């Protein structure tokens, strides 16, 4: 990685960490002016959006001090997780509820800024070996989240009423069959995002290696 790339890498990761901290503060406080279309307080930690952004923040912080192979793979995983959040909001929740609502206040960071920065930083500045296992591994957090979600409902029941409701994504309104299909589809989409990001990363990496050296 060249000096300018190292500087850009550090700057982007610092920005990611700062935005995650700000977004988490807004999410965890009970100040209604900070929130729009989002749960407040510790209950918000159960949501995939918050967890994926926290993961991205931790990985970005780690990348500031260590840039080994493990960190690069974690970069793909965090870009995939936040990329899934970005895609769901852009193509499903945004058209359904209005993009202006989905990108207000704390959601601007967790639905847009952090996911975009995570994906851009991975695609442009991270070199990851072309191995299928890393792409599969990048879908594992989504798989684990879904399994815990389902197991919690099976063990503790659906719950009484929202927001004290274990099926807080309301997948079971259509029955278990449809809910499991949605779950499987989301995991596959997550894997697809990992493949897409990895593919673009590979192409960008080839272009970077072909860049002519500046004349002396």
What kind of feature is each model-predicted range?
Residues 115-132:
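Alpha-helical transmembrane segments in multipass membrane proteins, preferentially the mid-helix core
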Residues 27-37, 90-100, 154-155:
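Juxtamembrane "helix-exit" motif on the non-cytosolic side of transmembrane helices
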Residues 156-200:
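Membrane-interface transmembrane-helix boundary segments in multi-pass integral membrane proteins
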Residues 105-116, 183-185:
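Membrane-interface loop-to-helix entry segments
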